[in-house]
Amino acid sequence: MGLEEKLPNGILLANVEKLVNWTRKTSVWPAAFGLACCAIEMMTVGGSRYDIARFGMERFSATPRQADLMVVAGRVTNKMAPVLRQVYDQMPEPRWVIAMGVCASSGGMFNNYAVVQGVDHVVPVDMYLPGCPPRPEMLLDAILKLHAKIMDEPINAKRAALRLESGARTELVPSSERYAPKNRSQRKLAERQQAAQRREMGAEKPLGALEERAELNAGR
């Protein structure tokens, strides 16, 4: 439009959306939610070598009401899932989630009844970070990609509609129908499957604590 040529030095032009998103991405406060070994790598990012303070993220919030980003670092059990959802619901908008590591992203090697097969069953995830555990450089790369995503987010009423379309109100659902049977017939079927697996392994019945200790003492 030629307006830039008529402005004096020291004046920049930008729209409100870009300014708001820039302030948001430069002051993202993470919520500490370390559950396993990935949390050690997340702590390393806060050290002087990687210096997450460069991005205004050195303050790991102990309360979800003063946090913008939840970094789920580790596996999430079914008993922990309601707590995770409650912490997420207490975070103010706008809020973002990074699933750090394969355990948080897809359950990892813990494919059983006790572990949620991906935190996206519980909360909406904005960034998936592979690795077991991922290195601190990978976490920094995911944070930079999240910053780029924040810069493109709308700040008007359209943002709420987009968040709903992306699953911002993710319901707390069981991670697997196989390991979380709902009715009696499904529970009976799961018990028969477990009994068949025990027979294949040579154990006719599940061992109790005393029986297991006796088996170990006998050298079996």
From Swiss-Prot:
Keywords: 4Fe-4S, Cell membrane, Iron, Iron-sulfur, Membrane, Metal-binding, NAD, Quinone, Translocase, Transport. SUPFAM superfamilies: HydA/Nqo6-like (SSF56770). Residues 210-220 have a biased composition (Basic and acidic residues). GO terms for molecular function: 4 iron, 4 sulfur cluster binding; iron ion binding; NADH dehydrogenase (ubiquinone) activity; NADH:ubiquinone reductase (non-electrogenic) activity; quinone binding. InterPro entries: NADH_UbQ_OxRdtase-like_20kDa, NADH_UQ_OxRdtase_20Kd_su. Its EC number is 7.1.1.-. GO terms for cellular component: plasma membrane; respiratory chain complex I. It catalyses: a quinone + NADH + 5 H(+)(in) = a quinol + NAD(+) + 4 H(+)(out). It is found in: Cell membrane. Binds 1 [4Fe-4S] cluster. The keyword NAD applies. [4Fe-4S] cluster binds at residues 37-38, 103, 132. It is a peripheral membrane protein. Its cofactor is [4Fe-4S] cluster. It comes from the Bacteria. It is an enzyme of class 7 (translocase). Residues 174-220 are annotated as: Disordered. GO terms for biological process: aerobic respiration; electron transport coupled proton transport. NDH-1 shuttles electrons from NADH, via FMN and iron-sulfur (Fe-S) centers, to quinones in the respiratory chain. The immediate electron acceptor for the enzyme in this species is believed to be a menaquinone. Couples the redox reaction to proton translocation (for every two electrons transferred, four hydrogen ions are translocated across the cytoplasmic membrane), and thus conserves the redox energy in a proton gradient. Belongs to the complex I 20 kDa subunit family. NDH-1 is composed of 14 different subunits. Subunits NuoB, C, D, E, F, and G constitute the peripheral sector of the complex. This is NADH-quinone oxidoreductase subunit B. It comes from Saccharopolyspora erythraea (strain ATCC 11635 / DSM 40517 / JCM 4748 / NBRC 13426 / NCIMB 8594 / NRRL 2338).
